[in-house]
Amino acid sequence: MSFWNSLSITTRYSRLPRCFFTYVQPTPLDNSRWLIWNSELAKQFDLPENVHNHSELLDAFSGEVVPSVFAPLAMKYAGHQFGSYNPDLGDGRGLLLAEIKDKKGNSFDLHLKGAGLTPYSRSGDGRAVLRSTIREYLCSEAMAGLGIPTTRALGMMTSDTPVFREGYETGALLIRMAETHIRFGHFEHLFYSNLLEELKLLSDKVIEWHFPCCLGEDKPYLAMFNNIVDRTAYMIAQWQAVGFAHGVMNTDNMSIIGQTFDYGPFGFLDDYEPGYICNHSDYQGRYAFNQQPRIGLWNLSALAHSLSPLIDKSDLEKALEQYEIKLHDYFSQLMRKKLGLLSKQEGDTRLFESMFELLSQNTVDYTRFMRVLSDLDSQDKQTVIDLFVDREAATLWVDLYLTRCKLEADSFDMRCSKMRKVNPKYVLRNYLAQQAIVKANEGDFSDVKILSTLLASPFDEHPDFERYAELPPEWGKRMEISCSS
């Protein structure tokens, strides 16, 4: 029996009507070889922890030999890109290979990114380059390490295939896993194409596969949308709390289950700059860090419009009204945890706001500040105050914070121990990713492997790797990244 036949693999998406996808065979790269295999993730699916002597895995994920249990397909969807509707979207470089169940019985998509041309490639070549593949692998695993809902990366390959972008780069492959690759844009495609029966079918399948709790509801489609609103609010609250800027929040990059999706020109905050723009194509700052909560609502409104044949307008409006309430509640809960506060007090929102104002006015590194604050039990308050130019204002805030901490039952030691579990020491700063990419292009993958290890446990000290927690050099701050992949 084939290795693949021994696993719990299905292809349920391929049973949908053909307006949802096109069957496409992957086009292999030249001399594909493993760069990283995520052994910890592999274990959850009974996949081998070591791939170096496992030719069937290499053959399948490089596209050389497609197992009979796979049904490779390119999904069709649409979406609003920078606010404008584009009907001509779909998987232009990636293929959904199959779905595989983990040890708990949960289904995950196996998706191959960089697999070659599809009918939706438009002017692209269907390839992914090493640079963008490294960025997506590292960031998806970094987000998982931070506890933020995200797609995952099972592995990546490099090759001998040259791919032209601004210049020639190395072709690469990413094996992405997600509970679903269904996006807001899938619903938009069906709605704007007037495929209303198919829109209902997709909604039924999304409920069956991802929101079975909605099956018994009087209004199951509304219940589904309420769940999407809730998960989106939670995801974006997590982004704002950790200082993550996605960079390209088009509706075709929004997961219907609230997972961070499609890592392109992302960035983590260095200095706390609310208006930080990480995408150099975002000339108007539509997707700036401080605009992400607003764009989340805009995107949900676009999805609501696409669901209007199934859900009453008044119900959709009420559901959308809950978004900002949920986002605020989730964000407040997360910030209390980051500050070691267990109880909810009336002045907490002002405490958070004054902290952000102070960080912004003094251009203080956000990750470093939160981590230093987590060590306040073993340092005097001056260590925190010295992070600021305006030490007088910083002293006032720290005193206010310490007064607030006295309302908690936890000791300082216990509070700080909890804070160190939610305030990371290591995040994927863009300059670190760039340094790893430069080395990788020279054949040295050591930084990629070190970062993948550190970012899997970002709250731990890792004393031998302190340099990866250092503040960025001036050239490494405010890096704007291209969408080119």
From Swiss-Prot:
**InterPro entries linked to this entry:** SelO (IPR003846)
The alphabetical list of record keywords is: ATP-binding, Magnesium, Manganese, Metal-binding, Nucleotide-binding, Nucleotidyltransferase, Transferase
* Cofactor field: Mg(2+); Mn(2+)
List the EC numbers from the record: 2.7.7.-, 2.7.7.108
Record-annotated residues binding ATP? G90, G92, R93, K113, D125, G126, R176, R183, D262
* Signal peptide residues on this chain, from the entry's feature table: none
A Pfam cross-reference name: SelO
Disulfide pairs?
A: none
Cite the active-site annotation.
D252
What's a single GO MF annotation on this record? Answer: magnesium ion binding
Q: Say if the entry is tagged with keyword DNA damage.
A: no
Which principal EC class is assigned to this enzyme?
transferase
Q: Where does Mg(2+) bind?
A: N253, D262
- For the keyword Nucleotide-binding, the answer is yes
- Reactions catalysed according to its record: L-seryl-[protein] + ATP = 3-O-(5'-adenylyl)-L-seryl-[protein] + diphosphate; L-threonyl-[protein] + ATP = 3-O-(5'-adenylyl)-L-threonyl-[protein] + diphosphate; L-tyrosyl-[protein] + ATP = O-(5'-adenylyl)-L-tyrosyl-[protein] + diphosphate; L-histidyl-[protein] + UTP = N(tele)-(5'-uridylyl)-L-histidyl-[protein] + diphosphate
> Taxonomically, which superkingdom?
Bacteria
In UniProt terms, what function does this protein have?
Nucleotidyltransferase involved in the post-translational modification of proteins. It can catalyze the addition of adenosine monophosphate (AMP) or uridine monophosphate (UMP) to a protein, resulting in modifications known as AMPylation and UMPylation.
Q: Which family does it belong to?
A: Belongs to the SELO family.
| Name of protein | Protein nucleotidyltransferase YdiU
Native species: Aliivibrio fischeri (strain MJ11)
